[in-house]
Amino acid sequence: MSLNLRDLEYFYQLSKLRSFTNVAKHFRVSQPTISYAIKRLETYYDCDLFYKDSSHQVVDLTPEGELLAMRTNEILSELNHTKKAIHRSSMKDFKVGFPPIISSYLLSKQDNLNFFNALHMIYGGSNELLSLLLNEEIDSSLLGSLEKIKHPQLEIEELFQKEFFIIMSDSHPLANEKELGFKDLLNEDFILLGEHNIHFNAFNRLNEKYNQSANVVLKLDDAHTIKELVRKNLGISLMADIRLSEDFKNLVKVPFIEEDKQFFHINYAYQKNSILSESEKNFLEILKTLK
């Protein structure tokens, strides 16, 4: 006797809904269809999978049923993942997550943008994109983090790191310092990138060491505007070197002392058991050339 995948689908849904009637409605089949499927599985595994009452309504899973439900969930999830992977491999373009800060840096480093025609670029914060990737709504993603990322579901390659600096006007009293500790900045006014940004997380990590003593006067999502305000000496900021490649006239960047140094990690992530298409492999090779 062979095992029928459809029977497993019926069984798994029954393990969740606990009602033959509701499962039949879910699949738009007759109730006897579900009943016969369960009987076939019980014959195949030579055990009862459910405790049933006299009206043939499911009361609960037997221990064997609990075990099969857990394994069936894994099997169906893997089959669904495989189906998506095969579908993705046949697509000419692929969905890649791009945090705006990383995409700006990446695009500024390219001499030819023709390759990007093969990309379906999905913009969002790193946390949002990570969620999309884990739910298989995108194929891969660039991700920013304050440390190396590890996840059992993902293959993650760290591409490079960029140091965080204190950014200030070249006329600021501290502009000529070779390095500064965060405690030296507690009386300064900070103008920062918003709370959903890795930069704000880096600032918070330092600020927590000093009981949130630093003064934040403004949070914006536009790095260019922040630089303009800092240039006018209306405050200072904290930015990773990835943000400092241009528009730096009349600004200085001062490194943190060793114990306060923070780093922006730029990563590329995709499903661990996925097979990369030629386009994806080429894209990864381009990413590996960046620093």
Swiss-Prot record:
DNA-binding region(s) from the entry: 20-39
A Pfam family of this chain: LysR_substrate
Keyword list, A-Z: Activator, Cytoplasm, DNA-binding, Transcription, Transcription regulation
Single GO MF annotation: DNA binding
Family per similarity comment: Belongs to the LysR transcriptional regulatory family.
Functional description taken from the UniProt entry: Required for malolactic fermentation. It is most probably a transcriptional activator.
UniProt name for this protein: Malolactic fermentation system transcriptional activator
Native organism taxonomy: Bacteria, Bacillati, Bacillota, Bacilli, Lactobacillales
Annotated gene: mleR
